[in-house]
């Protein structure tokens, strides 16, 4: 059995590759999604429950195609299992040296930077799970969060003002991103290094086009034991080696 951690564009791609190749697999996401290939489960794993699941299902290899910022999951996989882990990586735009682009390693570092380089209206594109992480900033400074429509309840629990929410999916439409910047008088953006799948290149282009700074939280390092693969050929080659 192959266990796939998805919930991403990459996860869907992996599921399609495995189905076409005839591999038996279980597709797992943290929350229930509309994309549910044959053998599907959802819900967060603890170290203990993941270890039990892998033993019960005779999992021989894990394909981690989850979000690059799913740090809790990455650590759980690392600590819970001793089967091979393939990391199906997304592509990332090259980091750019530009006066408007600021790569920072953490949210505390971003808050510190914003406190010393204040903006009037910050557009946060870091996702609903980061509302709490940025609370010390938005409690005192105007911040607009764009989040998925299904995530409103999480924002409400955090006490974030509903009038400062934009409820929509990220887009690859530069003009749409610029229209948001102009509509809300945005003069600063914070986002994550989420790669091409997260349309990072569009967010950077929008900031540069509008002449406003963009803070990019750099993606966390993955455990060294995760073996990276970048396309279908590499994935199938590694699976053949592991499962032969």
Language model regions located:
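N-terminal basic/disordered segments at the start of proteins
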Residues: 2-31
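N-terminal beta-loop-helix "entrance" segment that forms/cooperates
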Residues: 16, 26-47, 154-159
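Short, polar loop motifs at secondary-structure junctions
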Residues: 27-34, 88-94, 128-130, 147-153, ...
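Glycine-rich, highly charged phosphate/nucleotide-binding loops
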Residues: 38-57, 166-176
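Glycine/small-residue-rich loop that forms an oxyanion/phosphate-binding "nest" at active or ligand-binding sites
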Residues: 51-54, 61-109
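Hydrophobic, well-structured mid-protein blocks that either form specific transmembrane helices
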Residues: 85-143
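Anionic-ligand binding region
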Residues: 125-166, 174
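A C-terminal functional module that forms or caps the active site or interfaces directly
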Residues: 156-180, 184, 188, 193-210, ...
């Amino acid at each position: 059995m192959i266990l796939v951690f998805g919930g991403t564009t990459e996860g869907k791609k992996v599921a399609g590759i495995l189905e076409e190749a005839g591999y038996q697999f279980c597709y797992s996401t943290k929350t229930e999604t509309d994309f549910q290939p044959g053998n599907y489960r959802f819900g967060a794993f603890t170290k203990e429950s993941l270890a039990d699941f892998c033993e019960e299902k005779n999992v021989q290899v894990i394909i981690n195609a989850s979000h690059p910022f799913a740090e809790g999951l990455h650590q759980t996989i690392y600590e819970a299992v001793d089967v091979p882990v393939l990391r199906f990586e997304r592509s990332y735009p090259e980091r750019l040296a530009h006066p408007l682009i600021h790569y920072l390693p953490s949210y505390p570092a971003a808050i510190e930077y914003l406190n010393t380089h204040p903006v009037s209206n910050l557009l946060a594109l870091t996702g609903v799970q980061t509302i709490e992480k940025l609370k010390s900033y938005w409690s005192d400074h105007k911040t607009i969060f764009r989040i998925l429509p299904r995530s409103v309840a999480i924002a409400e629990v955090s006490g974030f003002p509903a009038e400062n929410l934009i409820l929509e999916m990220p887009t690859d439409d530069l003009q749409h991103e610029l229209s948001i910047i102009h509509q809300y008088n945005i003069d600063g953006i914070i986002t994550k290094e989420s790669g091409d799948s997260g349309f990072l290149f569009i967010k950077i282009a929008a900031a540069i086009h509008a002449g406003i700074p963009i803070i990019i939280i750099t993606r966390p390092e993955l455990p060294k034991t995760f073996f990276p693969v970048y396309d279908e050929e590499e994935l199938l080659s590694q699976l053949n080696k592991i499962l032969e």
